[in-house]
Amino acid sequence: MNVADLLSHLETLLSSKIFQDYGPNGLQVGDPQTPVKKIAVAVTADLETIKQAVAAEANVLIVHHGIFWKGMPYPITGMIHKRIQLLIEHNIQLIAYHLPLDAHPTLGNNWRVALDLNWHDLKPFGSSLPYLGVQGSFSPIDIDSFIDLLSQYYQAPLKGSALGGPSRVSSAALISGGAYRELSSAATSQVDCFITGNFDEPAWSTALESNINFLAFGHTATEKVGPKSLAEHLKSEFPISTTFIDTANPF
């Protein structure tokens, strides 16, 4: 199997062309005719991740956050140059899937959580189309116990919260990463909790005034889910060594 074959499989799986994304999905650096020898999957194509891909002897690196984004300057200098240089020196092909790996209904950063935690009455959630998030219901649980459950799932501590909702919860909406602005949409949906990665000042008063619990577990922690699920999927689909790289980014 070469990189072009892998890309064909990923495109069929993730349907990237239906998304208006913030950067290019698919092959960002490399040659599509390169044979796939070993695959590494990670959250972000930063220098540490690329170094670990080199150490793992992977020649394909699939990430959620690639190198190129809309509005970037054209010159390849500084940290971007260092990343690309290391990829090329070690013949690592870089593939990125951003919003498609948020929104996927079984492998994505959002739906995978809801499925793993046995939420029911699941439906798409968010203010953009295609919808990126998910909302659903579950057996009533104290908010502190719900936070502990999510912390164990994400293997990360709660980074920020504004507990404006009920102390006993049975519904939630979830969009991973930097989606704290979707808190208002969650309040409109009348769920008890909104779960995301990042937070900022407006989330505090919005949660308290909208009678909803806001929970942030970190951008990276909430966006490991999809890449990990994708790595497991590729292991089951192809007889090619596949590994997940975790740089332990606490943000």
UniProtKB/Swiss-Prot annotation:
Protein name: GTP cyclohydrolase 1 type 2 homolog
Family, similarity comment: Belongs to the GTP cyclohydrolase I type 2/NIF3 family.
Sample GO molecular function, one term: metal ion binding
Key words of the record: Metal-binding
Protein residues bound to a divalent metal cation 1: H64, D102, E223
CC terms in the record's Gene Ontology section: cytoplasm
Residues where a divalent metal cation 2 binds: H65, H219, E223
UniProt-listed InterPro entries: DUF34/NIF3, DUF34/NIF3_sf
Statement: the UniProt record of this protein carries the keyword Chaperone: no
Subunit structure: Homohexamer.
Gene3D superfamilies per UniProt: NIF3 (NGG1p interacting factor 3)-like
